[in-house]
């Protein structure tokens, strides 16, 4: 699922990619010190669940109390934009090419999967974070939990 480096990704497809990336990324505690994805995914899921009711409550409260509608609408729009910001960041991260250190680690995990007898599709172009998420998800399913200790 790597994208070629020279092809731009549309604004709205970043949201879809962010949602897919959040579902693909393994939420293992041992990955948290190295990757920020666990925290961003948790915050985004929380915002998706909580911010729409907060926006509705803000509007209803201001209307019921006879307050000004402008600040209430601005607050509601801000609350509704928070989950979108998380999904956009995750989508942008999913198409970001891996840095050299993480790239070496990515190939080591792929090698471990191949040594375990797993058939892997060849990597197209420069691997990105989505390819890393797919590989890690498969490694957590197919390999024992100690594969991270050796790396």
From Swiss-Prot:
Annotated Pfam families: DUF412
Organism domain of life: Bacteria
Membrane topology: Multi-pass membrane protein
UniProt keyword terms in alphabetical order: Cell inner membrane, Cell membrane, Membrane, Transmembrane, Transmembrane helix
InterPro entries with a match to the protein in the record: UPF0208 (IPR007334)
GO cellular component: a single term: plasma membrane
Major subcellular site: membrane
The keyword Cell inner membrane belongs to this UniProt entry's keyword annotation: yes
Transmembrane segments: 46-65, 69-91
Location in or out of the cell: Cell inner membrane
Cell membrane keyword on record: yes
Family per similarity comment: Belongs to the UPF0208 family.
Entry protein name: UPF0208 membrane protein ESA_00924
Organism: Cronobacter sakazakii (strain ATCC BAA-894) (Enterobacter sakazakii)
Lineage: Bacteria, Pseudomonadati, Pseudomonadota, Gammaproteobacteria, Enterobacterales
């Amino acid at each position: 699922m790597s994208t070629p480096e020279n092809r731009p990704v549309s604004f709205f497809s970043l949201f879809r990619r962010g949602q897919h990336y959040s579902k693909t990324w393994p939420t293992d505690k041992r990955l948290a010190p190295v990757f920020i994805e666990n925290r961003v995914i948790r915050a985004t899921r929380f915002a998706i669940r909580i911010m729409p009711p907060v926006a509705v409550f803000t509007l209803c409260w201001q209307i019921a109390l006879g307050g000004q509608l402008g600040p209430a609408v601005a607050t509601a729009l801000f609350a509704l934009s928070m989950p979108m910001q998380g999904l956009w960041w995750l989508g942008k991260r999913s198409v970001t090419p891996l840095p050299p250190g993480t790239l070496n680690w990515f190939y080591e995990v792929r090698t471990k999967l191949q040594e375990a007898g797993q058939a892997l599709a060849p990597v197209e172009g420069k691997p990105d974070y989505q390819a890393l998420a797919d590989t890690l998800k498969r490694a957590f399913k197919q390999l024992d939990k100690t594969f991270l200790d050796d790396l």
